[in-house]
Regions:
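Conserved N-terminal segment of class I S-adenosyl-L-methionine
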Residues: 1-89, 93-97, 107-111, 139, ...
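Glycine/Thr-rich phosphate-binding loops of Rossmann-like dinucleotide-binding domains
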Residues: 82, 104, 131, 181
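A short His-aromatic
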Residues: 98-102
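A short glycine-rich, Lys/Arg-flanked "PGG" loop and its adjoining helix->strand segment in the class I
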Residues: 107-121
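Short, glycine-/aromatic-enriched active-site segment of Class I SAM-dependent methyltransferases
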Residues: 124-152, 157-162, 186-188
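A SAM-dependent methyltransferase catalytic signature shared across enzymes that methylate proteins
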Residues: 158-174
């Protein structure tokens, strides 16, 4: 996570910003909670979008501060960060990129958002999907979904319930998972085969079709990750 900062921003976080820009056509000003190393804030900066972030991990904040020229990343504990949501009067988007799944009480920050002056909510969350079953079966492979720091996973149904419960309108959604890449990773890392043909064969019969296979799950909204943008009704 802390390595290859520039590549991560370019390949992972710039697409998240571009998706946001496609959905919200007006000027965007971001309050980013749980900013980590500031990758999303840097991507915003590259796209000339103002962003202000808070992160409780001091080491990650130091990393992000070195990389940014305009957008700000501040080290602040979670309780004090929550107050910033209510106090904010400049931002029109609250972003929680890979954050809700780490919170013991995710509804708390959502309630603060509902009480705030911020109009839009942008989230990225892991989903209960094929990857979940793979991780449960290949317990020797590093888990992405069933990580010990994840308190819960979402589904299409739970996200729709979330929107209805909080009187939010879904104005943008991007379903894009890594289930089949996870399958490929699990098979490669768990194989006992020493045959030189093993990897070329699995590349031919799985990896070569990985995007097409993944698109089936993405289109049916049963993939491993979702990005959603909500607007207050």
């Amino acid at each position: 996570y802390t390595n290859n900062f520039k590549d991560r921003v370019s390949k992972i976080y710039l697409p998240k910003v571009d998706f946001l820009k496609k959905v919200i056509k007006s000027n965007i000003n971001i309050l980013d909670i749980g900013s980590g190393g500031g990758h999303f804030l840097k991507a915003l900066e590259i796209r000339k979008i103002n962003g202000f972030g808070y992160e409780p991990n001091f080491s990650l904040v130091k990393l992000g501060q070195k990389k940014m020229k305009k957008n700000k990343l501040i080290n602040l504990d979670l309780k004090k960060t929550y107050k910033k949501v209510l106090e904010n009067n400049k931002s029109n988007v609250l972003s929680l990129i890979g954050v809700l799944e780490h919170l013991d009480k995710p509804n708390y920050i959502i309630n603060l958002f509902n009480k705030s002056k911020i109009k839009y909510l942008y989230i990225s969350v892991p989903l209960f999907s094929l990857s979940t079953f793979l991780e449960n079966s290949f317990d020797n492979v590093f888990p992405r979904q069933l990580s010990g720091s994840h308190t819960h996973l979402c589904t299409k149904e739970s996200l729709n319930f979330f929107a209805k419960k909080n009187n939010l309108k879904v104005i943008g959604e991007w379903w894009f998972g890594t289930d089949f890449p996870d399958l490929y990773r699990s098979l490669i890392n768990s194989s006992n085969s020493n045959l030189p043909k093993y990897k070329p064969h699995i590349n031919k019969y799985l990896f070569s079709q990985i995007d097409a296979l993944q698109s089936v799950l993405d289109k049916n909204k049963i993939c491993s990750q979702a990005h959603m943008i909500f607007e207050k009704n």
